[in-house]
Amino acid sequence: MPASTPPSPNPPSAPAADPRGDEDARASASPGPGGPPRAVRVLGVWAACTLLTLVLARLGAQDTPATPWGGSAPSWLEHMAFWDAGWYERILTEGYPSVLPAGADGAVQQNTWAFMPLLPLLAAASSSVTGLPFYASAALVSLTASAAAALGLDRWLAPRAGARQSLWAVALVWSSPCALILQTPYAEALGLALTAAALGLAHRRRFLIAAPIAALACLSRPIGVPLAAALGLWWAWELACARGRVPDAVRALLPGARPLTARQRLGLLGLTAWTGAAALVWPAAAWAVTGRMDAYTATETAWRGEHLAPFQPWLTRSGWWVGEHLGPVLLAAVLALAALGLASRALRSLGPAAWFWCAGYVIYLLAFFDPTTSVFRLLLPLAPAAWALPALVRGRRGRAALLLGGVVGQLVWISWVWDLGSVAIRWVP
């Protein structure tokens, strides 16, 4: 867009534009004189939560029967090979197929094209340096990325949420029901770290530096589409505000947000286009290698057994969860909960980068995701929303209750989901 387009005047309550972002607020999040460095405090909370999750996982492993991935009571290394971790190992040993496997009906079967290459490549590099086997190296990569994600989220959101509240948020995310995934050979931790870094840089108006990080995020997990959508929505909002098409009352929905200058809007637009292009790299690579334009999407839908139909899976799966007649009620409740969360002032106060990311990712899940039991794991990219929770739940007792609820959720998720077959319960009323 033309650099000469002037931004509209700020509403009376809005602060003046500041290209440095929230550096003044970030300074207020620094520890007082004599206190430990901020990073040490964040890593201390992260380490305590991560260690607790590891202890719970090792206790649960003792009750795990024989599984497709190993014998009963698996060791730590065997435990790391569960579920999708094996697909990443196959990428290194077998690569990506040039011919998509198909069943007797011609439908594409599950294969490695569904998994992005960044995690196995980093794990291979780690193995070459440390000599560790793949699953140990991949877990080490995830653990490192997990720590980086905690630091990145805190640096990005502590200036908005408050220093102490940010530590609570770190504890809530790393004590959430699916927190074990952040230390296993899954790409969730890597994707979260890169997404937080890219959005945090965009929040500070450093769009050029954010570009390569956003591209790496697109090669870690299928995160490129919602990331580009979030950035695009943010740019459209800024453009509409600059042209005076957004009433002051509507602008107040994102309190404290500093409007972008014309040059910054151009930078955000460039980052949006770059991220959108990066999101297409992996589907294009699958097309180039296999000769099938739909190689990536056909592979992704192999897990659901049907073609990609936006929004349709939520209609059908809601009945799978609670029954055909209660399904619409469940879906309505989920939509209402998502709307209430996005409408909360605490989340809106985190700034446009955080709010548009959460909105874009929720829309992405509703449009393209098949809500199986993996839905809980795939909510982890909404981690920035945890920085709004301390403002909604005030007082140590309420926050401690949230924390305890997350730990209880871990007990259930580890024993019922990760440790396949550990618990066999026949419910009675």
Describe each model-derived feature in a short phrase:
Residues 195-200, 208-235, 277, 362:
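Membrane-interface alpha helices of multi-pass inner-membrane proteins
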Residues 133-136, 153-175, 193, 209, ...:
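Transmembrane-helix signature of polytopic, membrane-embedded enzymes
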